[in-house]
Structure formats: C-alpha cells, structure tokens
C-alpha cells in the first residue's frame, strides 16, 4: 500500500496525521493541503470503521491512534459537556454512519494557498 511522505520523517508524519485525524473528529471539518487531506482521509475512515465495530479491541486500537484531547459540546438547552475525542468518535460520530459502507469524508477544493501556492482543501465528515 502506498503513502505520501509529506516531506517529513516517519515519526513526524505519523504525529501530524494523528493530530489532523483527531482535529477532524473533534471539529468535523478542517482546512489543510490536498496531499495531507488525502492521507488523513485514510486514517479517519479506519478510525470510524473501528468506531462502528465498537468492541473493546476496536476501542483500544483507536485509542492508540487518536490523541487524548478534550471535546466540549453544547446541547440544545445550552448545557456544556466535556469528553475525550475517542468518546466522541465512538458515541457520536460512528453511530451516524451505521448504515454507510465507507466514504465517511468529503474533500472540497478551496484554491491555492497565498504564501506558496499549495492547493488547499477542506476535508469534512459527510
């Protein structure tokens, strides 16, 4: 299976993909370069599939990849709840895609970045 090097060492690349995947799960929409988005899509699709499985082994596999970041959500009544990104993945994100067989993300092109002309995209959960 091929992958993009993204101009980084393997440990730097893995850390960046973990950060981007965690941010995408928390915010459900991030802006990044096209190459990074295509790589993070692979990781997030695997994490959502693990979330759909929902067993202990899947939770531990996802916990090894997803960062332990706090997520603050507000419900319709204005009550704030705090949980971890992993909990949001298993309790909120994955159940939305119970009937869907893959294709959990969408990549929309934004245009070139002003500084270096790199193609910028928005990756979001469908």
Curated annotation (Swiss-Prot):
One of its GO terms (biological process) is translation. The keyword Cytoplasm does not apply. Keywords: Ribonucleoprotein, Ribosomal protein. GO terms for cellular component: cytosolic large ribosomal subunit. Transmembrane segments: none annotated. It comes from the Bacteria. SUPFAM superfamilies: Prokaryotic ribosomal protein L17. One of its GO terms (molecular function) is structural constituent of ribosome. The keyword Ribosomal protein applies. Belongs to the bacterial ribosomal protein bL17 family. Part of the 50S ribosomal subunit. Contacts protein L32. NCBIfam families: L17 (TIGR00059). This is Large ribosomal subunit protein bL17. It comes from Lysinibacillus sphaericus (strain C3-41). The gene is rplQ.
């Amino acid at each position: 299976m091929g992958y993009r090097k993204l101009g980084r060492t393997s440990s730097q690349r893995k850390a960046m993909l973990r950060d981007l995947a965690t941010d995408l799960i928390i915010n459900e929409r991030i802006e990044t370069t096209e190459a990074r988005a295509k790589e993070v899509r692979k990781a997030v699709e695997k994490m959502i599939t693990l979330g759909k499985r929902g067993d202990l082994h899947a939770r531990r596999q996802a916990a090894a990849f997803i960062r332990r970041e706090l997520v603050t959500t507000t419900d319709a009544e204005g009550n704030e709840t705090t949980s971890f990104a992993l909990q949001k993945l298993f309790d909120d994100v994955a159940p939305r895609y119970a009937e869907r067989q893959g294709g959990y993300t969408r990549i929309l092109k934004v245009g070139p970045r002003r500084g270096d002309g790199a193609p910028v995209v928005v990756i979001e959960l469908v």
